């Protein structure tokens, strides 16, 4: 769970420079937390705490950050330990950035964190996106509860010159996304299938249950899982 907080910290840094990214989106601006390797090393896990505590010292203040920038985060959910850690990590990162750039009062970078309490409540997330976009934030950051349902909101953000950073669960039209921060979910699904096969052998009946069939992350994990079993 510490990785969730670390991801939030890194994400906040990405958001603040999103204005300098290619707003047409594309794979060049997409970052995965889990890459196609066989295992995460113990050394990587041990480095997470130090990454969390040394961000302020690592911030390159030569990068242009507009004073008074407003980051609007619309999460897939706000309840649950994972989302609370993501929020805490992002809030800590904003504090570190304000310290590094000596921003205060009206110059300070600010962040709001909103969304439904339940990840399944897509309607509330869409309504929240509408309200947030109407406030014209500097950057919109979101984790999509439904891969397709927020297309109109993404188009509205683009029309109003609001760069969009997506984290955790992506959207179908990545041309409207400036950057993505998340897991290689296809690989994660393949890894889960490989571990299961190691445990049960090469034959048997397997049932796959997906808690969130409309999210990109769940779809990719199931896809990767099935691909690994078919190989």
Positions of PLM-derived features:
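A residue-level marker of the well-folded mature domains of exported/periplasmic proteins
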Residues: 2-231
